[in-house]
């Protein structure tokens, strides 16, 4: 009887250990590091990250922009960023990823790195806090490609660009956005910051 109980215990421990190993393999991150910048806006919360499928990396991007609203409108400027992930060097074989975006504006056409190059770094144009005034958060974004070419989104011009992020040597595989939710009659800023995920391979 004791031998049977011992065998059952060993079997249970084996299953638990195997299951634990399977879980560890399942959640193993597909990215090498997370890269950010220092001048992001202060409002909002970090949304969920979105990743390119396995074997894909970002070689283009598009932005969601609300045009200037005039007086007494409420400007939000950049509301979202999408990564356009490719497999190999074909723009026809693409997958679009988007973390949470703001409610206003429309999406631009994608901007692509030349040839077989891919996105490796970014910087943000952010309007600093103004009081009294209409705050906007992120106004525009630039991405640097692996061949050194810099791409700038068709955003707005309030604020200044900060320093470039660190570079992702093997490319960008995902992003995460910091978004302020709609505030009704109060001042909205929408997109305030982003992070990018560097590919592991």
Curated annotation (Swiss-Prot):
Its subcellular locations are: Secreted
Keywords for the protein's UniProt record, in alphabetical order: Disulfide bond, Secreted, Signal
Provide an example Pfam family for this protein. VOMI
Which cysteines does the record link by disulfide bonds?
Answer: 52-85, 113-145, 168-198, 173-199
Q: Which GO terms describe its cellular component?
A: extracellular region
Is Signal one of the keywords?
Answer: yes
Give the species this sequence originates from: Mus musculus
User: Which CDD domains does its entry note?
Assistant: VMO-I (cd00220)
Family membership noted in the UniProt record: Belongs to the VMO1 family.
**Per UniProt, what is the name of the gene that codes for the protein in this document?**
Vmo1
What is the protein name for this chain? Answer: Vitelline membrane outer layer protein 1 homolog
Record's signal peptide: 1-21
């Amino acid at each position: 009887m004791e031998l049977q109980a011992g065998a059952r215990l060993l079997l249970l421990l084996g299953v638990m250990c195997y299951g634990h190993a399977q879980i560890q393999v399942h959640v193993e991150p597909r990215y090498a590091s997370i890269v950010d910048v220092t001048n992001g806006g202060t409002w909002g919360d970090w949304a969920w990250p979105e990743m390119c499928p396995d074997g894909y990396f970002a070689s283009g991007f598009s932005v969601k922009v609300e045009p200037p609203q005039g007086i007494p409108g409420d400007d939000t400027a950049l509301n979202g960023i999408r990564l356009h992930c490719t497999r190999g060097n074909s723009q026809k074989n693409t997958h679009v990823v988007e973390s949470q975006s703001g409610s206003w504006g429309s999406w631009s056409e994608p901007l692509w790195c030349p040839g077989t190059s891919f996105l490796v770094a970014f910087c943000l144009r952010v309007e600093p806090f103004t009081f009294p005034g209409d705050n906007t958060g992120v106004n525009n974004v630039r991405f640097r490609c692996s061949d050194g070419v810099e791409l700038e989104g068709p955003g707005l011009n309030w604020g200044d660009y900060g320093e470039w992020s660190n570079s992702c040597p093997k490319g960008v595989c995902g992003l995460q956005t910091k978004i302020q939710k709609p505030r009704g009659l109060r001042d909205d800023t929408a997109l305030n910051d982003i992070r990018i995920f560097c590919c592991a391979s």
